[in-house]
């Protein structure tokens, strides 16, 4: 049985912080419970992103889930037997929802990136290939978008905060612009 909860649930077996520290209560983790022995094993204790939507595929016996990965929401595959997690290669930065096929090795998802609207894809999980099925970007045809660039900041503790900034359309580096934070 697949369980989801905070690091402190189930007696704190998902905690991955120093003794005396309290883990984040919005950091959802995955656990596997053996029904016969009632033993529970943390599957994502050392996995940094916060686990979000989760589906166990009956076709390949893998768990597919989305997770907050820096400033994106990525799609991941967990093989419970091997305790292996890998990122599923998809063409969008934000996977907003997905559904796994019941009898085929595929899933559908919708997502978006910094400079496009929602798009719907079908992913062949054996080939690790995405096929675009629906593109709502046409809804933005009259909207002029500027460029989006990655921007990382290192705080005083040495933590890297990943972010991005957006330049206005027709950006001229010789002009001054207000910054909206």
Model-found features: residue ranges?
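Short loop/turn segments that connect beta-strands within beta-propeller blades
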Residues: 34-38, 79-83, 124-128
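Residue-level recognition of a conserved intra-blade site in WD40 beta-propeller repeats
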Residues: 56-58, 100
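Hydrophobic beta-strand anchors of alpha/beta hydrolase catalytic cores
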Residues: 178-180
């Amino acid at each position: 049985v697949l369980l989801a909860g905070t690091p402190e649930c189930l007696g704190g077996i998902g905690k991955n912080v120093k003794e005396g520290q309290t883990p984040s209560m919005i950091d959802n983790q995955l656990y596997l419970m053996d029904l016969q022995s009632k033993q529970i094993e943390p599957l994502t204790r050392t996995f940094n992103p916060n686990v979000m939507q989760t589906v166990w595929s009956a076709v390949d016996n893998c768990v597919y889930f989305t997770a907050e990965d820096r400033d994106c929401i990525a799609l991941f595959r967990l093989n419970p037997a091997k305790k292996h997690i890998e990122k599923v290669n998809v063409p969008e930065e934000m996977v907003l929802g997905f559904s796994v096929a019941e009898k085929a090795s595929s899933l559908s998802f919708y997502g978006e990136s910094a400079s496009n609207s929602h798009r719907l894809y079908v992913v062949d999980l054996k080939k690790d290939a995405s096929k675009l099925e629906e593109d709502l970007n046409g809804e933005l045809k009259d909207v002029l978008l500027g460029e989006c660039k990655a921007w990382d900041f290192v705080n005083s503790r040495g933590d890297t905060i990943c972010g991005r900034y957006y330049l206005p359309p027709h950006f001229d580096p010789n002009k001054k612009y207000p910054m909206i934070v």
